[in-house]
Amino acid sequence: MNRDEMYLSLGVSDKVLQFGEAVLDELKPRFAGIEEIAELNQAKVIGAMQKNRVNATHFAASTGYGYDDEGRDNLERVYASAFHTEAALVRPQITCGTHALAIALSANLLPGDEMLAISGKPYDTLEEVIGLRESPCSLKEYGVSYAQVDLREDGSFDFPAIERALNDKTKLIHIQRSKGYATRPSFSVEEIGQLIAFCKSCKPDIICMVDNLSLIHI
């Protein structure tokens, strides 16, 4: 039984099969682009592992408090090299994105500081972390205030409103890249880069935190 006969026996007509093949042909350039990105990212990771001289000893188990866990420390150096950052925190104890965001916020904000969300209201899961919903050990309870700048009606950043909202107490701005449950498009890396450059021009010492869903950049 050849392929066409097999599909026919499954109730798939020639018309449907030809349509599927036409769609695949149309998508070939997209698939090729994805494969190219994957290849480049793989090379980036391999380069980061070579730079940090990953070897068999880094995969050995450790005991005790983990102060000398060279495998863990080197893994974080590999992440930092791959993502071109000063440092990285990679731990199995960080169970989800909200957990990672809570760590980043708690580590960078002190009592009297202000967190400014400049892409509208963050995900619902952050409400208790910030203190928008009453919760023990929230940033609000810790003495950190919260302010928010909504996006424009077209889903773009409101630069004049952001500039007005920045003040002496503003320590950190929060940018949510994903559209979440909204209908706007997700922000591109270029758009976020322009936004951060603008915020830095207004307040050079501001900390810019980007919620990239599966990756947190500070």
Describe these PLM feature segments.
Residues 54-60, 139-147, 174-179:
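Gly-rich Lys/Arg/Thr-decorated short loops/hinges at beta-loop-alpha junctions or inter-strand turns
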Residues 88-114, 122-128, 132-133:
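Conserved beta-loop-alpha segment that forms the PLP phosphate-binding cup at the N-terminus of a helix
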Residues 92, 117-120, 176-177, 212:
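Glycine-rich, histidine-containing beta strand-loop boundary motifs that form or position
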Residues 5, 9-16, 20, 38, ...:
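Generic structural signal for well-ordered, non-membrane alpha-helical segments
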Residues 23-85:
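Glycine-rich phosphate-binding segment of PLP-dependent enzymes
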Residues 216-218:
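Conserved small/polar residues in nucleotide/adenosyl-binding loops
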Residues 124-147, 165:
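Flexible glycine-/small-residue-enriched beta->alpha junction loops
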Residues 153-213:
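Active-site phosphate-binding strand-loop segment of PLP-dependent enzymes
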